């Protein structure tokens, strides 16, 4: 059993032309692992602080500016295993309760059983393998920001609008990890009926290891014309959009950025929300392909019929 707490604060308000929203939260969760009689404190736990701020401004009656920023800072400490939380729980689940007494008077005791390796033969895991092995602490910081400008263009034709949007995201993760070894004991039955413990190995001090930090950064922008209009029972819409993005430090070939650009078109029609048709086309490209093969055209179309809107279907 572990204790966890969560606290959130939200503030919102504004005027007829300006609206804002601010949120902050803190989350803390204790660790499931408890260490006994070790010369260091591992402090297995997870802490997170997150924040968000949204601001919408009606610049004019037809122009809206939106700015959003969000992020979180979290720190996690877990046993030094190279595994995720799921892997550790699975190993504890697979370990046999009859294989060893475990901790006795602060000693890690390995008793002889039918399975002297402390685990079922087909699982390869043991919950006691995490005792005294060290720790891994991860500190992660992420930031997300975007800004968008919307402009109604009804003065040109009713239902026409334009928007431009840009976003930026970044992340940085640092690691602190240290390994250690712990002595184990095997019980030996003495002639007088008492039990003595034979010691193997020594409790060692933590040995800190270097691990490179991880980082990520990307940006995205788009500009689009939108059109939506009703003519009696006829509904039509159209979209023309340009977008561009770039990702730095991707997981594969982290020193090579990955960029994409595209133009998208879409047209839709429906009659009484009963018969529908849609056509899409995209012209997209990536700088990661060879020159002359970076762009492609991708069309798509569809038709729909909502039969439940027919008169013969209704009671």
Task: Kindly give the residue locations of the regions a language model identified.
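Residues on the lipid-exposed face of transmembrane beta-strands in outer-membrane beta-barrel proteins
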Residues: 7-15, 53-57, 145-151, 223-227, ...
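Outer-membrane beta-barrel architecture
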Residues: 19, 64, 140-144, 157-163, ...
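Short loop/turn motifs that connect adjacent beta-strands in outer-membrane beta-barrel proteins
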Residues: 16-17, 32, 62, 152-162, ...
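Outer-membrane beta-barrel transmembrane domain signature of Gram-negative proteins
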Residues: 1-12, 96-110, 178-281, 286-290
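Outer-membrane beta-barrel proteins
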Residues: 31-35, 76-80, 171-177, 187-188, ...
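Transmembrane beta-barrel strands of outer-membrane/channel proteins
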Residues: 24-26, 67-73, 164-170, 238-244, ...
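Transmembrane beta-barrel architecture of outer-membrane proteins
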Residues: 4-8, 46-52, 140-146, 218-222, ...
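Flexible loop and strand-edge segments within Gram-negative outer membrane beta-barrel domains
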Residues: 2-25, 29-32, 42-123, 136-140, ...
């Amino acid at each position: 059993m572990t204790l966890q707490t969560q606290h959130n604060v939200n503030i919102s308000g504004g005027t007829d032309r300006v609206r804002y929203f601010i949120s902050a939260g803190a989350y803390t969760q204790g660790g499931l692992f408890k260490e006994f009689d070790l010369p260091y404190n591992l402090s297995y736990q997870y802490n997170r602080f997150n924040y968000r701020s949204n601001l919408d401004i009606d610049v004019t009656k037809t122009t809206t500016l939106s700015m959003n920023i969000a992020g979180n800072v979290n720190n996690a400490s877990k046993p030094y295993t190279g595994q995720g939380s799921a892997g550790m729980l699975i190993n504890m689940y697979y370990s046999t309760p009859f294989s060893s007494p475990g901790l006795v008077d602060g000693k890690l005791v390995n008793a002889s059983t039918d399975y002297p390796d402390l685990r079922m033969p087909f699982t390869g895991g043991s919950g006691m393998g995490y005792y005294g092995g060290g720790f891994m602490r991860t500190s992660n910081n992420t930031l997300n920001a975007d800004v968008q400008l919307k402009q109604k263009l009804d003065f040109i034709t009713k239902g026409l609008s334009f928007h431009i949007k840009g976003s930026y995201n970044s992340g940085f993760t640092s690691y602190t990890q240290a390994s250690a070894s712990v002595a184990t004991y095997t019980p030996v039955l003495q002639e007088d009926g008492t039990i003595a413990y034979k010691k193997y190995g020594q409790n060692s001090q933590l040995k800190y290891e270097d691990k490179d930090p991880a980082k990520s950064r990307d940006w995205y922008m788009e500009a689009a014309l939108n059109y939506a209009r009703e003519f009696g029972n006829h509904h039509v819409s159209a979209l023309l959009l340009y977008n561009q993005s770039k990702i730095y430090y991707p997981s594969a070939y982290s020193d090579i950025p990955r960029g994409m650009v595209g133009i998208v078109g879409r047209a839709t029609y429906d009659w009484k929300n009963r018969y529908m048709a849609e056509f899409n086309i995209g012209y997209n490209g990536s700088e990661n392909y060879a020159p002359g093969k970076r762009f492609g055209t991708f069309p798509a179309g569809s038709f729909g019929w909502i039969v439940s809107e027919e008169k013969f279907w209704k009671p």
